[in-house]
Amino acid sequence: MSKAMPIAACGMAAVKQMQSLTLPWPSKDLSPNARVHWTRRSKAVKQARGYAEIMARRAGWGGLSLPVEGRLDLWISFYPPTRRLPDDDNMLARFKPYRDGIADALGIDDRRFVSHPLVEDDRRTGGEVVVRITGIE
């Protein structure tokens, strides 16, 4: 029998299912296909990583007690700003600074994440990325 505390008793989503986190559409400067100067890309990475960390902490993800080891599923839904659907590989690369910022907020190494990207057919003004984390048992 597991000694883990039930989700409801902990007052947090004990990694079974966490609340979703909504982030803005990633900058085109983060695309692996972008031909931008390295300083511009570096600035975009730093800004995106910091923003994701702040938003994850505001969402209450910074205080979660996570298992010490094991993998965590990272469900990423991309809602593009236009009808043009980007490929999921490019979007995952553009999402990497967000992933690092979320890992920073959780206090874990981002190697623990198993990414599940999905480019949605729905359009959202300005585009957005919705992230959920679930535990793998």
UniProtKB/Swiss-Prot annotation:
GO terms for molecular function: endonuclease activity; magnesium ion binding. Keywords: Endonuclease, Hydrolase, Nuclease. The keyword Cell membrane does not apply. Disulfide bonds: none annotated. It comes from the Bacteria. GO terms for biological process: DNA recombination; DNA repair. Belongs to the RusA family. This is Uncharacterized protein XF_1666. It comes from Xylella fastidiosa (strain 9a5c). The lineage of its organism: Bacteria, Pseudomonadati, Pseudomonadota, Gammaproteobacteria, Lysobacterales.
